[in-house]
Amino acid sequence: YRAKAFGNGEVERVSPMEQSGQHRYNMSPTGKWAIHTYSNASTPSVIDMVSFPKHQSVRMLEDNAQAKDQYAALGLNPKEFIKVKSGNLTLDAWMIKPVDFDASKKYPVIIEVYGEPASATVQDVWGNGDLWQQYMANQGYIVVSIENRGANTPRGREWRKCIYGEVGTFSSEDQSRGILDMARQYPFIDASRIGITGWSGGGSQTLNCMFRYPKVFHTGIAIAFVADQRLYDTIYQERYMNTPQNNPEGYRKGSPITYAEGLEGNLLLIHGTGDDNVHYQNCEMLVNKLIKNGKMFTQISYPMRSHSINEREGTTLHLRKTMAKYWLEHLPAGGK
């Protein structure tokens, strides 16, 4: 979009209407040229040079036609972008159905969550873990993602600011309400088989959901998670939460470790011992709290792996196999 720097002119769309999805621009200093990257959930990135003001394509740099054909040949069900409710608030979401989907049956759900203000999961864009999500859907699950309040999406000031000092509270509330509304809208969703998983901030929200709403979420996989917000780095945490000294109650309410005694379902904790972003002490402190409260869980630690848990031969495959195995064993797949 573009708008005049001065005056009250209308905002005008620049990106082509026929290209539904996400657009990125690397502008020239004069503003007359740009490297334009376009993609959506089923279209790999198309990169061309465009001229302004007409947004005219003057040179194709990469069309990724082969990748697009290969993806289409897989015959996967596309992501469906939908709306769900959290009270009076409308949330964006998507779902992926298995290729042998039968609308007369009820399917278990795996929710992919991030939930923190630094990013967003509901985007019509190429990648974002799509092939892994498709793989799990075709094991017999409905894979979904719901964008809660505060996520990094263009929904206005109040949407972004409302979670200040409250990171971790509104997000788990919205995830809980959102998935229950989705189950009401779509009879093929089995509300008795709901799983949730996330990495980093998403791992934290997985824990908050499992601990705070144990009647809604039955199985969770939390990866590289922050258990206590006081342990995370100041430049991120204090940006959204103020300081622990000024907002002790917010830090307490937003930290999963506060609610560990609420665990009722199946929980897998995964963390790299060499995580220099979310330090491993988060995992150790949560484990001690769960043990103290007599809560049963499963834990996988990857020695000297970082926050991404992808170092050393075989790690990524082992991690994904571990996750798939846990889902299949603890959240029975398939329509019933």
PLM regions and their residue ranges:
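Short beta-strand segments and strand-loop junctions that repeat across beta-rich extracellular domains
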Residues: 1-3, 210
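Short loop/turn segments that connect beta-strands within beta-propeller blades
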Residues: 4-8, 52-54
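Blade-edge beta-strand/turn elements of extracellular beta-propeller
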Residues: 8-16
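Long hydrophobic alpha-helices with heptad-repeat/coiled-coil character
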Residues: 1, 11-12, 224
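Serine-hydrolase catalytic core recognition
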Residues: 15-16, 22-336
